[in-house]
């Protein structure tokens, strides 16, 4: 059986790092991306390799679609050199940023940055990577609980996640002919450094979230 390979964007920290480590623990090889902290990515690669699987890291700015052709070429090169393959099996579109700003105060620049990273980026990155994704492969996109309920200060961020949910349904329909399944997960609040560690480090935000949670945890 061919060894499975997962490409995890934003895999050097937070949810992406955790996902990469969990996949590696189940025997999946990992190709992860990082935005700027190469050392953090290499540390994750080393941690993954200790689990007995292969791993590699590539730089990627998900917010700059002009770099995607070059990135796809890099992926193809790494697949050939490290795995002797022309395709990978799983794509996790995880990389992203957060924004806490009231609707009335959200700037066009903030909106555009979110759009580029949270929606346009995954849209066109996935498109560019389709020739490298194995038939019968899997794509997993990431939404948020904020697309299910309204929490003041997250209008722009939640709108992008809502867009990703619609996109996921269309991808599933259009890629099904290749046996590729496309799904999306919508995590709740997680204590990572995402969004500057707002959930983890801001006591007021923590209390507010706990107040909305059944067990208050």
Name what the model sees in each region.
Residues 12-13:
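Conserved glycine-rich cofactor-binding loop
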Residues 28-43:
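Conserved glycine-rich Rossmann-like NAD(P)H-binding loop of the short-chain dehydrogenase/reductase
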Residues 102-103, 107-115, 205, 209:
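Substrate-binding pocket helix/loop in short-chain dehydrogenase/reductase
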Residues 126, 160, 168:
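Active-site helix of classical SDR
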Residues 131, 173-174:
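Alpha-helical segment proximal to the catalytic Tyr-Lys
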Residues 144:
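Residue(s) in the substrate-gating loop at a strand-loop-helix junction
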Residues 177, 189-213:
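A glycine/serine/threonine-rich, flexible loop-to-helix segment
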């Amino acid at each position: 059986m061919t060894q499975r390979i997962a490409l995890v964007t934003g895999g050097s920290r937070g949810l992406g790092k955790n996902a990469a480590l969990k996949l590696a623990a189940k025997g999946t090889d990992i190709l992860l991306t990082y935005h700027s902290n190469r050392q953090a990515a290499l540390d994750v690669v080393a941690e993954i390799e200790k689990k007995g699987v292969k791993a590699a890291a590539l730089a990627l700015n998900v917010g700059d679609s002009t770099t995607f052709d070059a990135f796809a070429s890099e992926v193809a090169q790494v697949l050939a050199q490290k795995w002797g393959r022309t395709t990978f099996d799983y794509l996790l579109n995880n990389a992203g940023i957060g924004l806490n700003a009231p609707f009335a105060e959200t700037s066009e620049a903030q909106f555009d940055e979110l759009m580029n990273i949270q929606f346009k980026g995954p849209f066109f990155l996935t498109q560019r990577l389709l020739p490298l994704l194995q038939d019968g492969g899997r794509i997993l996109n990431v939404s948020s609980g904020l697309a299910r309920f309204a929490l003041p200060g997250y209008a722009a961020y939640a709108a992008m996640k809502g867009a990703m949910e619609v996109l996921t349904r269309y991808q599933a329909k259009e890629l099904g002919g290749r046996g590729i399944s496309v799904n999306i997960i919508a995590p709740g609040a997680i204590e990572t450094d995402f969004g500057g560690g707002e959930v983890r480090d801001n006591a007021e935000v923590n209390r507010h979230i706990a107040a909305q949670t059944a067990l208050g945890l």
